[in-house]
C-alpha cells in the first residue's frame, strides 16, 4: 500500500454506480451472522446516507447473481464500508458468502441507494425498532449519530430470538454506557439452557413500548425486520394513535407472496396479449452496441435489452436496488421507481431500466 493511500488530495468520492471493492475483514458477529468489510484499492470516500444499501455483483456456480444488502457501518468511517449478513438455511447467496468470501477477494458493488435513511427525515427524538438482522440499517443510523455527537435523543429497541442471536450486543452496550442520549432495550423471544437473561422476554407489545419509550408518540420511528415483525409493529402503532407519516420502514426478507402473484399475473397477461400494430410500437436504440428493437406499449427498457441479448444487471426488478441504471440520451420514459435512483441522477438523464416504459422512441447509451 502506498504512503499516500489516504491522502485527501488524491482520494475520490463514492458516486452512485458500479465500483470494484476488496474484502479487508470478516467479523463473526453471532453464530450465524458475519460482517464483511470492504475498501477500494484506489482510495474512495464511501459517503452515503445511513440506512442505504448496496447491491453485490456475484458469480455463483458460473451464473451471475445480484443481491442487495444494507450498509451496516457509518459514513463517519468513510474509507471503508461494511455489510452484515445472516446465514439463511437454504439461502443461495447468504450461504455462498459465508462459505466463500474471504479477505483479499474483490467483487463489484452497485450503489449506494435507498429512501430509508436518517438524513432525509431529521428529528430531535427517534425510536429505532429492529428485528433480527433488520438491525443493520438502524445500527448504521445509530453509529452515525454516536460518532458525530448529534444532539438526537435515541431509543434503540432490538428484538432477537435468544441472547446468542443478539447482533452487535457489546457495541450497543458500549454506546449506551458512553452517552446519555442513547437508551438501549433488547427483547429476547426465548433463552436457551444455560443462558442467563434478565431483560425483556417475548415479543414487543404496547406495555413494553410504553415502559421503554413513554413518549413514543412524539418520536420519529425507523423500523426494520422480517415481514411479520414489521406488520406487528405497524398494527401496534396504528392502533394507538401514532402519526404514521413519521413512521419509516425497510423490510428484510423474500418478496411478499402478493407481489410475486402480481408479477406472474402480468407475465401471463403479456403472453396472451394480441400482437400490437407497428404504428403503436416504440423504438428503443442502444447506441453502445448499435442494436435497436421495437417494443409494445408497457414494455420496459430492460425487457427490450433482454430481447436483443443485452445483459443489463438487475437485482430487484422493482426500482429499489438501482442496479439497472442506464443513461437515456434521447426520448421520454415513464419511470415508477421505489427509491433506487436519486433526483440528481434523473436530472442528468439516468433511468432505471427495469421500471422505465418508453413513451416514444428512446435512445439508451448501452
Curated annotation (Swiss-Prot):
This is Glycine betaine monooxygenase reductase subunit. Residues 282-366 form the 2Fe-2S ferredoxin-type domain. It comes from Pseudomonas aeruginosa (strain ATCC 15692 / DSM 22644 / CIP 104116 / JCM 14847 / LMG 12228 / 1C / PRS 101 / PAO1). In the N-terminal section; belongs to the FAD-binding oxidoreductase type 6 family. Disulfide bonds: none annotated. Gene3D superfamilies: 3.10.20.30, Nucleotide-binding domain of ferredoxin-NADP reductase (FNR) module, Translation factors. It catalyses: glycine betaine + NADH + O2 + H(+) = N,N-dimethylglycine + formaldehyde + NAD(+) + H2O. Keywords: 2Fe-2S, FAD, Flavoprotein, Iron, Iron-sulfur, Metal-binding, Monooxygenase, Oxidoreductase.
